[in-house]
């Protein structure tokens, strides 16, 4: 991976996104760009035009992307007092739609508009924040219908995109990442005793360490924060 090219973090103002951007700088990436609702240009996941404009801005910088990290996601909606479902009786259509808009549709549009900007000659990496509960094979406890389903759909997008990406550049890598339980606004209501809880900085360091050491055979994989692969 050529660290002199551009590293992009979408969702770079969130707890994990900001920590990822800082870690990339510490790892020697020369140009790290963060994009989100408060960036210039603005990138809003539910607005495809803004995603396209943000991609055009990156293209105008004149260098390819060596690493693209989608650090976006929603688990609960504080504004509307909506939390992950404990039972199918709590399924709410608007909350279900919102989970898919942020966790699935947004990343799909990032893939659409940013993949053409990935380095086509040297190794490039695209990583998207998923969640272990999005694994169908690992679902042992049920619940969290909207979040699980939207992250499972994201994982299918990542797996499918990894196949097409490798056809254009054998060195390109596309993976899903589970950051672990992190002290962030997203996961704060769900932290409990017995869980390994990391700071955003710890999680970012662990994930970047994985990404900079990926091999071509890792393309299309789902990684836990500790480097172990998670079944789809």
Features from the language model and the residues they span:
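Catalytic loop of short-chain dehydrogenase/reductase
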Residues: 74-77, 84-102, 119-168
């Amino acid at each position: 991976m050529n660290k002199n090219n551009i590293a992009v973090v979408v969702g770079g103002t969130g707890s994990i996104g900001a920590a990822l951007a800082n870690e990339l700088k510490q790892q020697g990436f020369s140009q790290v760009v963060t994009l989100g609702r408060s960036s210039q240009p603005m990138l809003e996941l539910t607005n495809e035009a803004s995603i396209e404009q943000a991609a055009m801005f990156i293209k105008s910088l004149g260098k390819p992307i060596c690493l693209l990290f989608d650090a976006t996601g929603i688990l609960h909606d504080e504004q509307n007092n909506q939390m992950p479902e404990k039972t199918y009786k709590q399924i709410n259509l608007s909350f279900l739609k919102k989970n898919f808009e942020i966790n699935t549709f947004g990343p799909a549009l990032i893939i659409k508009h940013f993949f053409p900007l990935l380095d086509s000659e040297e190794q490039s990496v695209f990583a998207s924040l998923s969640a272990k509960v999005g694994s169908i094979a690992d679902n042992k406890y049920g619940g969290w219908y909207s979040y699980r389903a939207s992250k499972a759909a994201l994982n299918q997008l990542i797996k499918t995109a990894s196949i097409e990406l490798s056809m254009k550049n054998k060195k390109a890598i596309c993976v899903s990442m589970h950051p672990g339980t992190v002290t962030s606004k997203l996961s704060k209501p769900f932290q409990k005793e017995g869980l390994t809880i990391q700071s955003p900085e710890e999680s970012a360091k662990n994930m970047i360490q994985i990404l900079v050491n990926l091999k071509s055979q890792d393309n299309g994989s789902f990684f836990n924060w500790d480097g172990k692969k998670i079944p789809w």
